[in-house]
């Protein structure tokens, strides 16, 4: 059998090794100059005024919700077809996640679904830029402005995604992920961008014990060695080891995403003759980052179920992923919201399958996946 082809693999090279070596030899390995450089680089990428690096996108979501003072009695609108961390953070703060349906073919939450879910208790809207494509963020922000509701963009899939000529996050507040399978990675990490100076100041405090400044700031700027605790906070800072890797990856972003796009195009051409349905692309002008390549496996149409397809691919040495099982079908949320029905979300949750997609894949690797799909479709 051929070597196992994983669903994803980080694209690491000598540059990342050199970046880590530099940090280790510098004597400053926790939050420091590499964090500052990463934040500045993201501001240049997105055009935002502020960037705050954190230990994970989940941490970023947690402190953003906290900074917006979301808590008991509040509602936050978000799709169910997302990773559960968003729902978990909303719930842990005592608020209620209001899960809405998505478009059947793009898997994007729609402005119409969001607006229909607004109540006097709605405190925030969290759209997801799904799989590397952008949601219709102008329309969603317009709803937020009309009702006076904050919009927090879940941009975990969207490093390198553009909407109408603007990088995701521009002129708003968005949270990116540097998890191991993301378009750029430092194993674990995240980053928040915003143009809201007050929000940025609160996020910096909340991510580091509620202190007004961190240790590197105190050393660099000659401040008093004992900083003041201004509010209870968390330990969500990113180390410079991680930041150095992320910064090196960011410099490669165009190359990494170009390779993802080439593989996605190879899949798209082959799938035109197969019953497996890829996601539709959004109608608005955009640049897709191709974080994921997702097909829908409908048993009646394809002659095989999604789970059987994933198992058959595994037997052929090909890994796959599931992004995502709908959050409202998970035990905790199913029991909390037993009557919730989201038809498009549920239909897709039972059929979606993520194919291998990462920059170090070869054309032959993609051909191997395509050949297996052709065999399993009976063609």
UniProtKB/Swiss-Prot annotation:
One of its GO terms (biological process) is lipid A biosynthetic process. InterPro entries: ArnB_NH2Trfase, DegT/StrS_aminotransferase, PyrdxlP-dep_Trfase, PyrdxlP-dep_Trfase_major, PyrdxlP-dep_Trfase_small. Pfam families: DegT_DnrJ_EryC1. GO terms for cellular component: membrane. Gene3D superfamilies: Aspartate Aminotransferase, domain 1 (3.90.1150.10), Type I PLP-dependent aspartate aminotransferase-like (Major domain) (3.40.640.10). The modification N6-(pyridoxal phosphate)lysine is found at residue 182. It catalyses: UDP-4-amino-4-deoxy-beta-L-arabinose + 2-oxoglutarate = UDP-beta-L-threo-pentopyranos-4-ulose + L-glutamate. The keyword Lipid biosynthesis applies. One of its GO terms (molecular function) is pyridoxal phosphate binding. Pathway: Nucleotide-sugar biosynthesis; UDP-4-deoxy-4-formamido-beta-L-arabinose biosynthesis; UDP-4-deoxy-4-formamido-beta-L-arabinose from UDP-alpha-D-glucuronate: step 2/3; Bacterial outer membrane biogenesis; lipopolysaccharide biosynthesis. Its cofactor is pyridoxal 5'-phosphate. Its EC number is 2.6.1.87. PANTHER family: TRANSAMINASE, UDP-4-AMINO-4-DEOXY-L-ARABINOSE--OXOGLUTARATE AMINOTRANSFERASE. Homodimer. Belongs to the DegT/DnrJ/EryC1 family. ArnB subfamily. This is UDP-4-amino-4-deoxy-L-arabinose--oxoglutarate aminotransferase.
């Amino acid at each position: 059998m051929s070597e196992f082809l994983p669903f994803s693999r980080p694209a690491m090279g000598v540059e990342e090794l050199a970046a880590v070596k530099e940090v280790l030899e510098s004597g400053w390995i926790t939050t420091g100059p590499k964090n500052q450089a990463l934040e500045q680089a993201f501001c240049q990428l997105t055009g935002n005024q502020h960037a705050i690096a954190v230990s994970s996108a989940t941490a970023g979501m947690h402190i953003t919700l906290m900074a917006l003072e979301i808590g008991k009695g509040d509602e936050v609108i978000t799709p169910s077809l997302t990773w559960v961390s968003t729902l978990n953070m909303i719930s842990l703060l005592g608020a209620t996640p209001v899960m809405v349906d998505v478009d059947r073919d793009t898997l994007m939450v729609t402005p119409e679904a969001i607006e229909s879910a607004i109540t006097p208790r709605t405190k925030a809207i969290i759209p997801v830029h799904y799989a590397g494509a952008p949601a219709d963020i102008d329309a969603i922000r317009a709803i937020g402005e009309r009702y006076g509701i904050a919009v927090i963009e879940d941009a975990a899939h969207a490093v390198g995604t553009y909407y109408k000529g603007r990088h995701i996050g521009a002129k708003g507040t968005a949270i990116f992920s540097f998890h191991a399978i993301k378009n750029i990675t430092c194993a674990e990490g995240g980053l928040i961008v915003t143009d809201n100076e007050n929000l940025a100041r609160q996020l910096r405090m909340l991510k580091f014990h509620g202190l007004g400044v961190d240790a590197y700031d105190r050393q660099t700027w000659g401040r008093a060695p004992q900083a003041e605790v201004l509010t209870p906070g968390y330990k969500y800072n990113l180390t410079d080891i991680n930041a150095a890797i992320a910064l090196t990856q960011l410099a490669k972003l165009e190359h990494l995403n170009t390779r993802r796009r080439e593989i996605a195009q190879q899949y798209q051409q082959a799938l035109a003759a197969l019953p497996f349905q890829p996601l539709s692309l959004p109608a608005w002008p955009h640049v897709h980052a191709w974080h994921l390549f997702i097909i829908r496996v409908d048993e009646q149409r394809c002659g095989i179920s999604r789970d059987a397809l994933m198992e058959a691919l595994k037997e052929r040495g090909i890994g796959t992923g599931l992004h995502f099982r709908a959050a409202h079908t998970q035990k905790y949320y199913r029991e909390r919201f037993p009557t919730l029905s989201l038809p498009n979300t549920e239909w897709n949750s039972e059929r979606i399958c993520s194919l291998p997609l990462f920059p170090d894949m070869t054309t032959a690797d993609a051909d191997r996946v395509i050949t297996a799909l052709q065999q399993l479709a009976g063609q």
